[in-house]
């Protein structure tokens, strides 16, 4: 099990480096472009995006954390779609439907993080079939809560950046409601990961969750039947 975990993390490390390299190259190019254009808003957003792959490794240096490369791939991959592509390239504005795709994926993304959090909080941290219902309910409710908080954040930030982030002028409350609906759909799409994990079945995402728990809490996280 330990060798298998190490092999998965080595492969994930190579994938992460590829994602991070392309991420940084795009952000640097955008910083130069927006500096030439004197576009202060997009320049600041691009600089902020460039800081993320620098900050992420620093988080793992906290004494109670151990780096999980497969989790890094998930985090940076989602941030890349939402931040450099969505906000810096401005696909949220230029590509119809991109905003809804991002919100759908955010539901899946947050659900997986919530599933990891569930097993981190669970006494003993063991992964077993008895967790199916509670773990799944936890990830669903956590994801929906984050979706609501995100919309509150957009509402608060709109006055600061001077942009109609929720498209209230054009859609009223429809855009915010649709965002939360598609986020919930993305959450539902992640339910099979929780079920497969509880049953001890392997998969890219279920392995990522299991590896994260195992690296932090040890072999007691092996799937246990009841």
List where the protein language model places each region.
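N-terminal membrane topogenic signal
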Residues: 4-22
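Membrane-interface helix-boundary motifs at transmembrane edges
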Residues: 9, 38, 58-71, 125-131
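Membrane-interface helix caps and helix-loop-helix hairpins in membrane proteins
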Residues: 33-41, 62-65, 88-98
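Cytoplasmic-side transmembrane-helix entry/capping segments in multi-pass membrane proteins
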Residues: 44-48, 66-78, 100-103
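Alpha-helical transmembrane segments of multi-pass membrane proteins
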Residues: 53-57, 78-86, 111, 115, ...
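Interfacial helix-loop-helix junctions of multi-pass membrane proteins
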Residues: 89-99, 144-188, 192
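Membrane-interfacial alpha-helical segments at the cytosolic side of multi-pass membrane proteins
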Residues: 105-122, 159-165, 184-197
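Short, highly charged, low-complexity non-transmembrane loops/tails of multi-pass membrane proteins
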Residues: 201-226
